[in-house]
Amino acid sequence: MKALARFAVLSGSVALTFFTMAGPEPLSVNESKNEAKPEEPRLWQGFYIGINAGYAFDLDTDVSDLDFLNAGPPVRTFSFDSDGPVAGGQVGFNLQPLSWLVLGIEGDVGYLGVHGRARQPGSPPAGTFAEINPGVYATARGRIGWAHDNWLLYATGGWFGSDYERRIDDTTICSCGTVLGKGSNDDFESGYTVGGGLEWLFRDHWSLRIEYLYFNLENSTVNVPVFQSGTFRFGFDDDGHIVRGGLNFKF
């Protein structure tokens, strides 16, 4: 009986040794690390579309009164600020080559609900008034961002354009009498924009963002006909700031 027990123990030891040797080879340290760290998902990569709304503030308008068309450098300059709501929509594409790096392009179209009007300081009550009426605006921008989990901190910049109406109502009193002049310029003006934002991916395909943009438009001129052959010229230089929130859906 004891011999049978010894045989059983010996047989079990041999079998255990055999299966241990025949099992899978242990992973090296490097292989263990690689298997323990799966590749992080590219949460931000792909196309997206969304809406936005916010506020435009400190839209600074510098008006240069150049007097007659060929009078040379500006003789009087004044400024005024405007503000108002903005709303629109955006579409874009993100590429995420690294887990922490996001590169993208974005375009958006919106409306600037801003109106500004001011009288030239020092002019009589019925003197010179400058007015701006922005409307539809658009941007085409690049984006570069730092991603951490479902958060994205990014910088952005590119082209900015807006339908910008500028008006001058001028009443000049001189030795020849009272001269009334009106002029306007309603063009789609181009410039540049820079800014940044923070975006939060709160569900699989949905994200919320807060974004700031500074924009600067090229200078524009309004000619005001006076007398029969004379013209007053007024130069406009406009820039401003936009803060807006947005909601995006990523495909």
Where are these regions (language model features)?
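Gram-negative outer-membrane beta-barrel domains
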Residues: 2-251
